[in-house]
Amino acid sequence: MKTLPLFVCICALSACFSFSEGRERDHELRHRRHHHQSPKSHFELPHYPGLLAHQKPFIRKSYKCLHKRCRPKLPPSPNNPPKFPNPHQPPKHPDKNSSVVNPTLVATTQIPSVTFPSASTKITTLPNVTFLPQNATTISSRENVNTSSSVATLAPVNSPAPQDTTAAPPTPSATTPAPPSSSAPPETTAAPPTPSATTQAPPSSSAPPETTAAPPTPPATTPAPPSSSAPPETTAAPPTPSATTPAPLSSSAPPETTAVPPTPSATTLDPSSASAPPETTAAPPTPSATTPAPPSSPAPQETTAAPITTPNSSPTTLAPDTSETSAAPTHQTTTSVTTQTTTTKQPTSAPGQNKISRFLLYMKNLLNRIIDDMVEQ
């Protein structure tokens, strides 16, 4: 029992001794830092005459600076002039420099003189490029006039006339980028080739080219693309009576309704004329059989789909039958105009509306079924 207090006393004394020694060491370190004096030794150094160490003046030692900024700059030698002279200093040889500078100025003045002609030539070439479509339209109109006059004068010019008319419409279509207006003229151009096969008499063969010469005029006279496909057909109607010949007027109507034997298919081998007859004959499937699978455009497919859905196609097909029986050519022209307008309106409006109506009906049925199921639950 007595050993415990003794052990505690010994520990306390040792701690106090160590703490006191630590305080003394800290005091010595602080004294050295503040006064910068080493502790006094037991013996003193011998006294030398002269200034003490702290009284001697500080002598700087010269050291080499390795940086470029510390190196002294050499004076510029006349043989090797500086690469980048100061701009403020005038040149040493003004005569030579002036003679050298002047050619550069002349060269700079000559450069724009060379560039100006190039700009002028560019400006002159641009109007030529812009005038090309106008020239093309004027040439196409001239060709149309020439074809109409040549057809009216001679009968044996029948073969070149349809070619000219078929070549003429594409030029105005290029100038007027309107798909509906371009789809309408081929219907009018389709009329001439079939009657040429049905009417084998020479006067009648001279007549169809007149009808072919008439249709190309509407695309030239109707440059407005926004108008629907019907207006160009209405404008195409007046040129047919302007011919005022009985044969051509009778030839304008039959192409829509005549289920002609395979002879017209042999005569109508042109792609434009072959693709158009199925467009005009919407209801009867016989003309489509007569045409021997030409590279028809997607337009005929639209026309075949339209008459099936719309009931208005039946009266249009019945009207031309009466026109065939009637001998008066004037009635045939009127009926042909009406049928053309109806057939063109159908493909533009019917297919899209039918698809939309079917889709809406399907959605309504689904909604009704869902509502019924919810109510039953």
From Swiss-Prot:
Keyword check for Repeat: yes
Glycosylated residues in this chain: N97, N128, N135, N146, T176, S182, S183, T188, T189
Pro residues composition-biased segments: 73-89, 169-183, 215-229, 284-298
Annotated spans, Disordered: 70-100, 150-355
Keywords on record: Asthma, Glycoprotein, Repeat, Secreted, Signal
Segments crossing the lipid bilayer: none
GO cellular component terms given for this protein: extracellular exosome; Golgi lumen; plasma membrane
Post-translational modification: N- and O-glycosylated. Contains fucose, mannose, galactose, N-acetylglucosamine and N-acetylgalactosamine.
Bias type Low complexity, positions: 184-214, 230-283, 330-348
Span of the signal peptide: 1-22
Record-linked InterPro entries: MUC7
Tissue expression pattern: Expressed in salivary gland tissues and only in those that contain mucous acinar cells (e.g. sublingual and submandibular glands) and not in salivary glands containing only serous acinar cells (e.g. parotid gland).
Composition-biased stretches (Polar residues): 309-329
Function field: May function in a protective capacity by promoting the clearance of bacteria in the oral cavity and aiding in mastication, speech, and swallowing. Binds P.aeruginosa pili.
Protein name: Mucin-7
The organism of origin for this protein: Homo sapiens (Human)
Lineage: Eukaryota, Metazoa, Chordata, Craniata, Vertebrata
